[in-house]
């Protein structure tokens, strides 16, 4: 019998990707295609759902043919996706009734303020683990029902379907047969009770969203059904679904309570596995579902930082002090440390654990002796400081002391940043050999469901270290750095609060 592989589909915010993995978790083949970002008004962000499907189906076929294989070589398909992005389509025609409203879209911010004024925030947080925010799917669905002609009537008649991107892909891969999602994607809608594992009727009523629109919620690792499209000649089991950050946590094999990963991308996403019980955050973190395998649910705490790698793009595009992002490490190494210069990159407000929408980027401690190297160093340091703020909040909420931080994402290739991250945390930052942890997590979930891999223990043995960064900064110096950062954060907030 020929060797078989797992196909992971990674549907992201700017591109659709497909990756083939072998039994050792190695990448065999990759295909990627970008798609359009649509900005109808300031603060609005949309995608064309048909383009999402076309690009994802296209790269799926491409990754398989690139490797000289066909559908019979694929043991299972796992899906991971940009979370919260909202699609509503007509069940009969299969056509979207409006563009996908993307997670970044802020058009429903005023409606969220109304919900808070009605006193809904405590109920939403208690049931879903989420704050009331336009980031999540619920108010996006409501906007479509209120603003697309005939949508409300069709929804009442049961003619419309809602789904996050995973649901939309499965619906199309199964020729409109399966309307499902997994618990991780459901947990990001602001409509799913993470304790009962059911759609919450009281929240649906409060938002005036018919339950008939919603997909069936399934575990993250399960054989859902076979593909039925012409993308592949043979039927392949669809067997794993998880939102991107949940998949990355699983791909990093953070399978035990207290294990944490940080994905350093445009922003940072830190997720801590908190085991089988949800922990309510007292420090402005989000309580969410890590994954469900069989009957077992794992919960997580999550904190998101808006500006991480984006601060390096700003050094390049805004200040012009580097020509490419890869130059930042060399420039920053031109100084031993930041010499009292601190950059708080609150270009879009501050995310977790501060959640201050009015804060703006601020640069402190600048003297005549300050150079572009100091600013580059302060920019990199700011990524590590913001991550530390979230990790300290996670420790406070969970009562668990973090032993190490598993790192992934584009900016984790920056050795200077990773070393400083270890220095100020006082724990090791560990970088895996396989950096494609999100796609790998989706592959692992699908492979477990089909018996391609035996159990989680087998997968834990596949996790391989590429580099371990251990703290080397003396404790008194680390404390001085942290004190300066805390002063900078306080000053940035004071600036935001000024009349």
Curated annotation (Swiss-Prot):
The residues that the entry says bind sn-glycerol 3-phosphate are 13, 83-84, 135, 244
Q: What modulates its activity?
A: Inhibited by fructose 1,6-bisphosphate (FBP).
Binding residues for glycerol: 83-84, 135, 244-245
Catalyzes what? glycerol + ATP = sn-glycerol 3-phosphate + ADP + H(+)
Q: Give me the Gene Ontology terms describing cellular component.
A: cytosol
| Binding residues for ATP | 13-15, 266, 309, 313, 410
Its annotated pathway reads: Polyol metabolism; glycerol degradation via glycerol kinase pathway; sn-glycerol 3-phosphate from glycerol: step 1/1
Q: Which UniProt keywords apply?
A: ATP-binding, Glycerol metabolism, Kinase, Nucleotide-binding, Transferase
**Coiled-coil intervals, chain numbering:** none
HAMAP family for the chain: Glycerol_kin
- Quote the function comment for this protein: Key enzyme in the regulation of glycerol uptake and metabolism. Catalyzes the phosphorylation of glycerol to yield sn-glycerol 3-phosphate.
Stated name of the protein: Glycerol kinase
Species = Paraburkholderia phymatum (strain DSM 17167 / CIP 108236 / LMG 21445 / STM815) (Burkholderia phymatum)
């Amino acid at each position: 019998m020929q060797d078989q592989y797992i196909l992971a589909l990674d549907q992201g915010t700017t591109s659709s990707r497909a990756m083939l993995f072998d039994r050792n978790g190695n990448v065999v083949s990759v295909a990627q295609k970008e798609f359009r970002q649509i900005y109808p008004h300031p603060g609005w962000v949309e995608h064309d759902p048909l383009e999402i499907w076309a690009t994802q189906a296209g790269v799926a076929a491409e990754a398989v043919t690139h490797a000289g294989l066909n559908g019979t070589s694929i043991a299972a398909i796992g899906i991971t996706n940009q979370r919260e992005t909202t699609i509503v389509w007509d069940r009969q025609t299969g056509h979207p009734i409006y563009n996908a409203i993307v997670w970044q879209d802020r058009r429903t911010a005023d409606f969220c303020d109304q919900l808070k004024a009605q006193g809904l925030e405590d109920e939403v947080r208690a049931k879903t683990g989420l704050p009331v925010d336009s980031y999540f799917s619920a108010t996006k669905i409501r906007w479509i029902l209120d603003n697309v002609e005939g949508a409300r009537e069709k929804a009442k008649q049961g003619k419309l379907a809602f789904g996050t991107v995973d649901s939309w892909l499965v619906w199309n891969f199964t020729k409109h047969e399966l309307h499902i999602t997994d618990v991780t994607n459901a947990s990001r809608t602001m409509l799913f009770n993470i304790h009962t594992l059911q759609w919450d009727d009281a929240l649906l009523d409060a938002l005036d969203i018919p339950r008939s629109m919603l997909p069936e919620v399934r575990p993250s690792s399960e054989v859902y059904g076979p593909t039925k499209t012409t993308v592949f000649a043979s039927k392949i089991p669809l067997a794993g679904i998880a939102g991107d950050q949940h998949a990355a946590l699983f791909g990093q094999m953070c399978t035990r309570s207290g294990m944490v990963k940080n994905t350093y991308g445009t922003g940072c996403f830190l997720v801590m596995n908190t085991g089988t019980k949800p922990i309510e955050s007292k420090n402005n973190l989000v309580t969410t579902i890590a994954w469900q395998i069989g009957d077992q649910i794992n919960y997580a705490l999550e904190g998101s930082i808006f500006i991480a790698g984006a601060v390096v793009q700003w050094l390049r595009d805004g200040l012009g002090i580097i020509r490419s992002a890869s130059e930042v490490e060399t420039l920053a190494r031109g100084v031993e440390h930041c010499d009292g210069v601190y950059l708080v990159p609150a270009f879009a407000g501050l995310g977790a654990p501060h959640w201050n929408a009015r804060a703006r980027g601020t640069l402190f401690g600048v003297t005549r002796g300050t150079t572009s190297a100091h600013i580059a160093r302060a920019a990199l340091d700011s990524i590590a400081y913001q991550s530390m703020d979230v990790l300290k909040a996670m420790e406070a909420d969970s009562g668990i002391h973090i032993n190490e931080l598993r790192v992934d994402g584009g900016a984790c290739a920056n050795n200077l940043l990773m070393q400083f991250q270890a220095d100020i945390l006082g724990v090791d930052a560990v970088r895996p050999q396989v950096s494609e942890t999100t796609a790998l997590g989706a592959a692992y979930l699908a492979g477990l469901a089909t018996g391609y891999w035996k159990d989680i223990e087998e997968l834990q043995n596949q996790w391989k270290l590429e580099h371990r960064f251990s703290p080397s900064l003396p404790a008194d110096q680390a404390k001085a750095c942290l004190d300066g950062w805390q002063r900078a954060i306080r000053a940035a907030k004071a600036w935001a609060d000024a009349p």
